[in-house]
Amino acid sequence: MVLVRKIRFEDLDAVTKIEADIFHQPWKYSDFEDMVDKSDRGYVVIELDGRVIGGAAYRNILGDVEITNVELEKEYRGNGYSHILIEEVIKEGKNSGGESFTLEVRKSNLAAIHLYESHGFVTEGVRKGFYDFPKEDALIMWNRNAN
């Protein structure tokens, strides 16, 4: 069974490990801890049969919701779970007063770009050399009409 919900303290070890397995410069335990029970930012986890397999972080800045992290264990990619996460982040972002949504994505991450485009995001800019390991540009994507 799939369940998507807000992060709880008991999820911190799992999401910290997922983050460390995916990113070269992962968030720390304390970064995720700061997402629990906040009104202007949050983190949603996705569980499969009671086990956390991924999540997504967001923060509301004066009505613009920035999606800062989307992560899913590699073996669960390509099964629609990322779509569920994006839908939940948009819902939670709207609940926090968000009107527009933005994110950055590696220019080479075509799977993620297609995911975001399928949820109404369009590329509106580029941050040159934004990412390290390897150095790469970031596309700045926006969804200004989230339904």
Where are these regions (language model features)?
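Conserved active-site tyrosine of GNAT-family acetyltransferases
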Residues: 116, 121, 141
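Conserved catalytic-core motifs of GNAT/GCN5-like acyltransferases
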Residues: 104, 122-138
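Conserved acetyl-CoA-binding loop-helix of GNAT-fold acetyltransferases
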Residues: 78-91, 114-118
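Conserved hydrophobic beta-strand within the GNAT/NAT acetyltransferase core sheet
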Residues: 67, 101-105
